[in-house]
Swiss-Prot record:
Residues with the Phosphoserine modification: S787, S886, S1013, S1065, S1067, S1074, S1083
GO biological process: cell division; DNA repair; meiotic cell cycle; mitotic spindle assembly; regulation of DNA replication; sister chromatid cohesion; stem cell population maintenance
Entry PTM: Phosphorylated at Ser-1083 in a SPO11-dependent manner. Acetylation at Lys-105 and Lys-106 by ESCO1 is important for genome stability and S phase sister chromatid cohesion. Regulated by DSCC1, it is required for processive DNA synthesis, coupling sister chromatid cohesion establishment during S phase to DNA replication. Deacetylation by HDAC8, regulates release of the cohesin complex from chromatin.
Function: Central component of cohesin, a complex required for chromosome cohesion during the cell cycle. The cohesin complex may form a large proteinaceous ring within which sister chromatids can be trapped. At anaphase, the complex is cleaved and dissociates from chromatin, allowing sister chromatids to segregate. Cohesion is coupled to DNA replication and is involved in DNA repair. The cohesin complex also plays an important role in spindle pole assembly during mitosis and in chromosomes movement.
Tissue expression per record: Spermatocytes (at protein level). Widely expressed, with higher expression in testis and brain.
Residues with N6-acetyllysine modification: K105, K106, K140, K1190
Superkingdom field: Eukaryota
Sequence ranges assigned to domain SMC hinge in this UniProt record: 530-642
Name of the protein in its database record: Structural maintenance of chromosomes protein 3
Residues with Phosphothreonine modification: T783
Annotated organism of origin: Mus musculus (Mouse)
Subunit structure: Forms a heterodimer with SMC1A or SMC1B in cohesin complexes. Cohesin complexes are composed of the SMC1 (SMC1A or SMC1B) and SMC3 heterodimer attached via their SMC hinge domain, RAD21 which link them, and one STAG protein (STAG1, STAG2 or STAG3), which interacts with RAD21. Also found in meiosis-specific cohesin complexes. Found in a complex with SMC1A, CDCA5 and RAD21, PDS5A/SCC-112 and PDS5B/APRIN. Interacts with PDS5A and WAPL; regulated by SMC3 acetylation.
Entry similarity comment: Belongs to the SMC family. SMC3 subfamily.
Length: 1217
């Protein structure tokens, strides 16, 4: 076993949690500067293991907590982990952790994370070899110097500690204390014996007179007994007579109470029936109100539908007339359009012919004009240009410009041609699209009509289901009211049961149910749920005739909880307390009940109570435990006899009870408050309530849920249809919008077609003129430059002038004619497009709209809905009439029940009056019985006061009359007066004092024997203490010599025991001392005393020569330290520990001796662990592991370091120390 690891937090200079790397099982060296925390590390281990820190005051605990920068430390702990692979600690683990935690108000030990006491820790350490008498397995800083300078007496004290004499001293002190106490008791007993002897002498003289007194007193008591006994017998006879009368009266009272209870039961039954009928009436009236509200709503809906149907019929009638009018108007419009189109067809050829002529004339006029202009220009170029070349140059330039202009004109003409062709193609495409859209429009209209029809079908079905649901809701409401009434009835019965049972018990039952519900909800402890079987009362049945006796027998045990095992009850109670639930509970664990079979008496006057109970055989133990030792008897007399004979509890059917111990209990028991009856009623009401709830859930609510689901489905269908309707109507509007747009496009295209044609003709005429000019210029190119036209050209000019004038005149005539025809065409087209055709479109649209409603879909749906609402109104009125009839019949039934209630009330009152009269008579008898019982008690008391009497006293005076008895009694009293001064207790006192004397003598002998035993024990303890010191001295002395020779080769050292009877200059070794001790003590006692020893001296020689042996005072400081170390090693060899902690033990040694100490530690480290601190390099050589302690920011840290780092630190510290 050794220290494997140390964990420190908050202790002295170690603030943060410091986990020291595991130690070697041999030699570990810790190095560090002064004040870095090495000693605090040793203090931490000592804090856990040593007695030095056992009883710390609060201020001492605070002093051990770390103080530094940062937040204040409020608690600290030191944990030591031991390697226990050798099982030196009696714990079956290879690693054992021991932790001590302190704070301002706490000081706790934890062994393997479990809290233990300080004594447990100390006992555990002692079992592992840590002796309280030898604390030298931890050697603190300065301890070596302290031992080196200690006097001889101090070393003797140390030797006594190592020898363990403290135990002997403690036992000796206890023995001395016990001996003093025994001596005091012996003196007291002697005083008492002296007093008793004197008192016995006095009582001997009083005994003679007492004998005469006792003779007459015996006679007096016999006479008084006879008188009292006669009075007692007379009183008993009268009591028996009264008991017989009371029994007869009690039977009559029972009959009257039974009759009264029957009347009350009938009244309660009638009240229940009246409540149920009133609840039924209330439900019917509420249903009637609901029906009335429904009927009002239905009538309102019917009125709306009737108005809507009428409006639709009127609308359809008006639509028919309008359609005829529109068709007639459309026909007229078509005729007018045809007429105008015919007129247009006649005018357009004329217009086109005139226009064509005009265009040809304009083109010819432009050509002739251009040709003339060219000829004039040709004439002018003679004066314009000076030479032919200049003119040709200009013509070429002009031709180039003309070619470009002609090309531009051709492109424009080609573009207009293409535009006209595209317009014609678009016109055809537009027409195709328009026809397609018209076809789609008809399909969409048909689909909208179909959706309208489907929508109204679904709506009608939904309305029918809603009507059915309303009926079911009314039914559910009626059932809910019946359920509420039944629940109210159950609550009343539960309240009665609560009133008859203790609040704590009922709270306990409720709390147990909460615990089980918690388990069920969490899905845990299934075996606990299965192992709980409810209270006793819920687990059996019996005939009502036995309710009273069963209930009286069980009492509150009726509410004990049956469980399979004590484990189940423990689990329930743990959760019960964890949830802080109220109430009290008592469990009957079947596995713990010890029930034995009972031998019941074979008699016709009694039966075992358990035979009249019906229960699950599984719970036989529980019921035998509660009822197994009880008999149901015919009468109280039988109960008394059987209880005495068979030591069993007996009870009558009326609840009068006789305990096997002799106690009698009984009296009137109110059966109306029977808890078994109440529990039966509660259970029955719960079953009825469960049936009603099941019916409500299985039938009505399931149907309502089904209808709700169907209505939701229909509502979803209606929403889907509405969505589709909106979609198709939007599609229809979109198609109409597209058709309108196409029509407008076509009209716009027709409007732009004619201007484009005219523009084309103008461009073509201009192109001809430009081509003519180009040809003229080309012809002129290369000709001679002339200032005058040639004759041919002049003729051509004249001819052109004539042609131009003629063409202008023709063109004016054609223009006038074209304008006239164009005006006619424009007027006709405008009338067609802006008037006739536009109106025709409007008429067509109105006809289409009329066609949408013309099918009567809405009217058909409205008519169907109206028929359905009429049927619902009729059904509602029929149901309302049925409810009126039912209400009348139910109210009549209530009146009959109320009459019956009055009759039963009168009967109950008659029985009550009879019971009251009987009760008064019974009270009189009870008062008389009470007086007789009092007299009986007085007689019995006086007889008891007479004390024990001889047998002759019971028979001697039985034949005498009361008069004679009183006469003899008077004579006895006269004689007794003569002995009034006699000590009547003289004989008793004499016997009593004699007995006390014997007891005291025995006690005195016991004390004498005890005193002798204590003296013997003290002698044995003194001898053992002497032997222990002698043995320890020999072992330590031997070890000291051996260790010193190893530390100082060639040296010699001995220990010397010093004694009190020897002069201070005289000292002897262990052997001589032993002989002197025995001789010195032999003159006084056979037991040698350790008090003769005064000290332990040390004599050493560092050279080995006998003549150079010196005392400790004669040695240098380093030699003293070495000797002290040798003594410590010797003590440790005598009482070895599993590990040792040395704090700077080599401080005062020179290098040679430090090396010897290091070698010694290396030798001892084979069998024990060493943890040492040093500032010298010698101890490092024998070490197996090295640790360095650093102090940063007022906090210590300890880490594993290498041997080289440890040597460097020691050398550096030695250099700069």
């Amino acid at each position: 076993m050794y220290i494997k690891q140390v964990i420190i937090q908050g202790f002295r200079s170690y603030r943060d949690q410091t986990i020291v790397d595991p130690f070697s099982s041999k030699h570990n060296v810790i190095v560090g500067r002064n004040g870095s925390g090495k000693s605090n590390f040793f203090y931490a281990i000592q804090f856990v293991l040593s007695d030095e820190f056992s009883h710390l005051r609060p201020e001492q605990r605070l002093a051990l907590l770390h103080e530094g920068t940062g937040p204040r430390v409020i608690s600290a702990f030191v944990e030591i982990i031991f390697d226990n692979s050798d099982n030196r600690l009696p714990i079956d683990k290879e690693e054992v952790s021991l932790r001590r935690v302190i704070g301002a108000k706490k000081d706790q030990y934890f062994l393997d994370k479990k809290m233990v006491t300080k004594n447990d820790v100390m006992n555990l350490l002692e079992s592992a070899g840590f002796s309280r008498s030898n604390p030298y397995y931890i050697v603190k800083q300065g301890k070596i110097n302290q031992m080196a300078t200690a006097p001889d007496s101090q070393r003797l004290k140390l030797l006594r500690e190592v020898a363990g004499t403290r135990v002997y001293d403690e036992r000796k002190e206890e023995s001395i204390s016990l001996m003093k106490e025994t001596e005091g008791k012996r003196e007291k007993i002697n005083e008492l014996l002296k007093y008793i002897e004197e008192r016995l002498h006095t009582l001997e003289e009083e005994k003679e007179e007492l004998a005469q007194y006792q003779k007459w007193d015996k006679m007096r008591r016999a006479l008084e007994y006879t008188i009292y006994n006669q009075e007692l017998n007379e009183t008993r006879a009268k009591l028996d007579e009264l008991s017989a009368k009371r029994e007869t009266s009690g039977e009559k009272s029972r009959q009257l109470r039974d009759a009264q209870q029957d009347a009350r039961d009938k009244m309660e039954d009638i009240e229940r029936q009246v409540r149920e009928l009133k609840t039924k009436i209330s439900a019917m009236k509420e249903e009637k109100e609901q029906l009335s509200a429904e009927r009002q709503e239905q009538i309102k809906q019917r009125t709306k539908l009737e108005l809507k149907a009428k409006d639709l019929q009127d609308e359809l009638a008006g639509n028919s007339e309008q359609r005829k009018r529109l068709l007639k108007e459309r026909q007229k419009l078509l005729e007018k359009i045809e007429e105008k189109q015919k007129e247009l067809a006649e005018t357009e050829p004329k217009f086109n012919s005139v226009k064509e002529k005009e265009e040809r004339g304009i083109a010819r006029l432009a050509q002739a004009t251009q040709e003339r202009t060219d000829l004039y220009a040709k004439q002018g170029r003679g004066s314009q240009f000076t030479s032919k070349e200049e003119r040709d140059k200009w013509i070429k330039k002009e031709l180039k410009s003309l070619d470009q202009a002609i090309n531009d004109k051709k492109r424009q003409i080609a573009a207009i041609h293409k535009d006209l062709e595209d317009t014609e193609a678009n016109k055809e495409k537009n027409l195709e699209q328009y026809n397609k859209l018209d076809q789609d429009l008809n399909e969409v209209k048909a689909r909208v009509e179909e959706l309208d029809r489907k929508y109204y079908e679904v709506k009608n079905k939904k309305d029918e289901l809603q009507s059915e649901r309303n009926y079911l809701w009314r039914e559910e409401n009626a059932e809910q009211q019946a359920l509420a009434a039944k629940r109210e009835d159950l609550e009343k019965k539960q309240q009665l049961l609560r009133a008859a049972t203790g609040k704590a018990i009922l709270n306990g039952i409720d709390s147990i149910n909460k615990v089980l519900e918690h388990f069920r909800r969490k899905g845990i402890n299934q075996h606990v749920q299965n192992g709980y079987h409810g209270i006793v009362m819920n687990n059996f049945e019996c005939e009502p005739a036995f309710y009273t006796c069963v209930e009286v027998t069980a009492g509150n045990r009726l509410f004990y909880h049956i469980v399979d095992s004590d484990e189940v009850s423990t689990k329930i109670l743990m959760e019960f307390n964890k949830m802080n639930l109220p109430g009290e509970v008592t469990f009957l664990p079947l596995n713990k009940l010890d029930v034995r079979d009972t031998a019941y008496p074979e008699t016709n006057d009694a039966i075992p109570m358990i035979s009249k109970l019906r229960y699950n055989p599984r719970f036989d133990k529980a019921f035998k435990h509660v009822f197994g030792k009880t008999l149901i008897c015919r009468s109280m007399e039988v109960s008394t006899q059987l209880a005495r004979a068979f030591t069993m509890d007996c009870i009558t059917l009326e609840g009068d009870q006789v305990s096997h111990r002799g106690a009698l209990t009984g009296g009137y028991y109110d059966t109306r408050k029977s808890r078994l009856e109440l529990q039966k009623d509660v259970r029955k009401a719960e079953e009825e309530l469960g049936e009603l709830e099941a019916k409500l859930n299985e039938n009505l609510r399931r149907n309502i849920e089904r209808i709700n689901n169907e209505i939701d489905q229909l509502m979803n269908q209606m929403q889907q249809i509405e969505t589709q309707q909106r979609k198709f109507k939007a599609s229809r509007d979109s198609i109409l919008s597209e058709m309108k747009m196409l029509k407008e496009k076509r009209q716009q295209s027709e409007k732009t077609f004619m201007p484009k044609q005219r523009s084309l003709q103008s461009l073509e005429a201009s192109l001809h003129a430009m081509e003519s000019t180009r040809e003229s210029l080309k012809a002129e190119l290369g000709t001679d430059l002339l200032s005058q036209l040639s004759l041919e050209d002049q003729k051509r000019v004249d001819a052109l002038n004539d042609e131009i004038r003629q063409l202008q005149q023709e063109n004016r005539q054609l223009l006038n004619e074209r304008i006239k025809l164009e005006g006619i065409i424009t007027r006709v087209e405008t009338y067609l497009n802006e008037n006739l055709r536009k109106r025709l479109d409007q008429v067509e649209q109105e006809l289409n709209e009329l066609r949408e409603t013309e099918g009567g879909t809405v009217l058909t749906a409205t008519t169907s809905e109206l028929e359905a609402i009429n049927k619902r109104v009729k059904d509602t009125m029929a149901r309302s009439e049925d409810l009126d009839n039912s209400i009348d019949k139910t109210e009549a039934g209530i009146k009959e029940l109320q009459k019956s209630m009055e009759r039963w009330k009168n009967m109950e009152k008659e029985h009550m009056d009879a019971i009251n009269h009987d009760t008064k008579e019974l009270e009189k008898m009870t008062n008389r019985q009470g007086m007789l019982l009092k007299k009986k008690e007085e007689c019995m008391k006086k007889i008891r006061e007479l004390g024990s009497l001889p047998q002759e006293a019971f028979e001697k005076y039985q034949t005498l009359s009361l008069k004679q008895l009183f006469r003899k009694l008077e004579q006895c009293n006269t004689e007794l007066k003569k002995y009034s001064h006699v000590n009547k207790k003289a004989l008793d006192q004499f016997v009593n004092f004699s007995e006390q004397k014997e007891k005291l003598i025995k006690r005195q002998e016991e004390l004498d024997r005890g005193y002798k035993s204590i003296m013997e024990l003290m002698n044995v303890l003194e001898l053992r203490k002497y032997e222990a010191i002698q043995l320890t001295f020999k072992q330590v002395s031997k070890n000291f010599s051996e260790v010193f020779q190893k530390l100082v080769p060639g040296g010699k050292a001995t220990l010397v025991m010093k004694k009190g009877d020897v002069e201070g200059s005289q000292s002897q070794d262990e052997g001589e001392g032993s002989g002197e001790s025995e001789r010195g003590s032999g003159s006084q006692s056979s037991v040698p005393s350790v008090d003769q020893f005064t000290g332990v001296g040390i004599r050493v020689s560092f050279t080995g020569k006998q003549g150079e042996m010196r005392e400790m005072q004669q040695l240098s400081g380093g030699q003293k330290s070495l000797v002290a170390l040798a003594l410590i090693f010797a003590i440790q060899k005598c009482d070895p520990a599993p590990f040792y902690l040395f704090d700077e033990i080599d401080q005062a040694l020179d290098a040679q001796h430090r090396k010897a100490v290091s070698d010694m530690i290396m030798e001892l480290a084979v069998h024990a662990q060493f943890i040492t601190t040093t500032f010298r390099p010698e101890l490092l050589e024998s070490a197996d592991k090295f640790y360095g302690v650093k102090f940063r920011n007022k906090v210590s840290h300890i880490d594993v370091i290498t041997a080289e780092m440890a040597k460097d630190f020691v050398e550096d510290d030695t250099t700069h120390g």
